[in-house]
């Protein structure tokens, strides 16, 4: 019964849900306002076309604890280190007829279905109501919804991006709390310049799948999709989708957010995953602050014959401050109950970094160091298992160019 009540609550979210909205960064990569690169538009301004580019190149260092390493195969503590290209995005965005926005972008650094990073169009019937269709960011988490290239640190919080640990050997069941990009349809809008809403239906298969592969839920008898909604309250006007921008050092904005989703028959039809998140973000002149807390429940479908469900908690606090016009210092404290609330122990992950914005050329340098610590576990085995696959010490130096 509780499952059906949860679905019903999400179904009525369009009546009350409110969400973040910012016109200048609708494509999630660069501004339409013409600050980066160039824009082609008609004299009336009803047709706008803007090509854009974002390239990130990083040097990475990762050191892993001995647990999980097989010395017989000469596995080293230092691994997954060297140079990488997280994003090489080429795309175009724009507006047509004064009410239709569109975006298409390719991430050449990805593979498979993830090559198509975004592909959507958005019809704004009025400021309070618009419909978006295609591949875009799901309405969950301030960290994910921040404009790509304007994040405080080059790595997402581990509590959002890392898979949880389940006490079963099911290789196909590796959920993480963040939902990221997906294919679907969403209604959204802005009310009284303070409230907004996003409510959508998505495949729930993530950024790497561009095909229709879903069915009906055998247990709940509804389409096996991701049902998601997000609301925010911005008392001082729309919060910019940035975590640090040297051209926006006179802002005074604050955001409070609530989001939730149910992914029906996710993980290859093995689980029903429920997520809830709380958000806070603040921009006050040179200062940026943000905090998020999120919860995920993983319940198995009847065909798995596993009666237990598992709960996971995570969250982070982060802040940045411009100590000079183009130099931002950054810090984050991330915490993750990766092995579930039934077992004691958390990962706690402090990180520090800095961002330098080169004048007049759209270059950005980011530096970050993170330590993954473990606290409160009952046994040494639990402690060893909790950070499997995660680097104990990691450092990243990334150079980014956009136009």
Where are these regions (language model features)?
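Outer membrane beta-barrel transmembrane domains
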Residues: 316, 320, 326-374
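Outer-membrane beta-barrel "beta-signal"
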Residues: 226-238, 354, 358, 363, ...
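Sequence/structural signature of outer-membrane beta-barrel proteins
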Residues: 58-67, 107-111, 140, 202-208, ...
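Detector for outer-membrane/organellar transmembrane beta-barrel domains
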Residues: 230-339
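N-terminal periplasmic/intermembrane-space "pro-region" immediately following the signal or transit peptide
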Residues: 4-56, 192, 403
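Outer membrane beta-barrel
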Residues: 38-71, 75-207, 223-238, 318-330, ...
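Transmembrane beta-barrel architecture of outer membranes
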Residues: 87, 116-118, 182-184, 224-228, ...
């Amino acid at each position: 019964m509780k499952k059906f009540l949860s679905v019903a609550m999400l179904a009525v979210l369009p009546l009350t849900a409110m969400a973040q909205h910012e016109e200048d960064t609708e494509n999630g990569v660069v501004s339409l306002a013409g600050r980066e690169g160039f824009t082609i538009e008609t004299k009336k301004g009803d047709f706008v076309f803007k090509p854009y580019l974002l390239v990130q190149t990083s040097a990475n260092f990762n050191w892993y604890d001995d647990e999980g390493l097989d010395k017989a195969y000469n596995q080293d503590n230092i691994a997954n280190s060297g140079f990488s290209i997280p994003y090489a995005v080429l795309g175009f965005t724009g507006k047509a007829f004064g009410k239709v926005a569109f975006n298409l972008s390719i991430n050449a650094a990805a593979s498979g279905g993830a090559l198509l990073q975004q592909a959507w169009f958005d019809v704004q019937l009025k400021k309070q109501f618009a419909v978006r269709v295609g591949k875009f960011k799901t309405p969950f988490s301030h960290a994910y919804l921040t404009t790509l290239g304007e994040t405080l640190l080059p790595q997402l919080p581990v509590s959002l991006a890392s898979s949880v640990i389940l006490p079963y050997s099911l290789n196909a069941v590796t959920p993480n709390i963040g939902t990221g990009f997906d294919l679907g349809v969403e209604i959204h809008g802005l009310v009284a310049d303070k409230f907004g809403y996003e409510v959508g239906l998505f495949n729930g298969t993530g950024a790497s799948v561009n095909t229709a592969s879903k069915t009906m839920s055998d247990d709940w008898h509804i389409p096996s999709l991701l049902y998601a909604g997000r609301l925010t309250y911005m008392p001082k006007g729309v919060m910019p989708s940035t975590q640090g921008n040297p051209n926006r050092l006179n802002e005074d904005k604050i955001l409070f957010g609530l989001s939730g989703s149910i992914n029906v028959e996710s993980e290859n039809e093995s689980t029903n995953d429920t997520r809830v998140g709380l958000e806070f973000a603040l921009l006050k002149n040179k200062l940026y602050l943000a905090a998020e807390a999120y919860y995920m429940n993983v319940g198995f479908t009847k065909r798995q014959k596993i009666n237990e469900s598992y709960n996971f908690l995570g969250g982070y606090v982060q802040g940045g401050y411009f100590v000079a016009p183009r130099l931002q210092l950054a810090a984050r404290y991330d915490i993750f109950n990766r092995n579930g609330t039934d077992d004691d122990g958390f990962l706690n992950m402090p990180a520090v970094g800095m961002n330098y914005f080169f004048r007049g050329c759209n270059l950005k340098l980011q530096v970050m160091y993170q330590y993954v610590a473990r606290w409160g576990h009952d046994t040494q085995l639990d402690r060893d298992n909790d950070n499997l696959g995660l680097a104990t010490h990691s450092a990243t130096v990334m150079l980014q160019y956009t136009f």
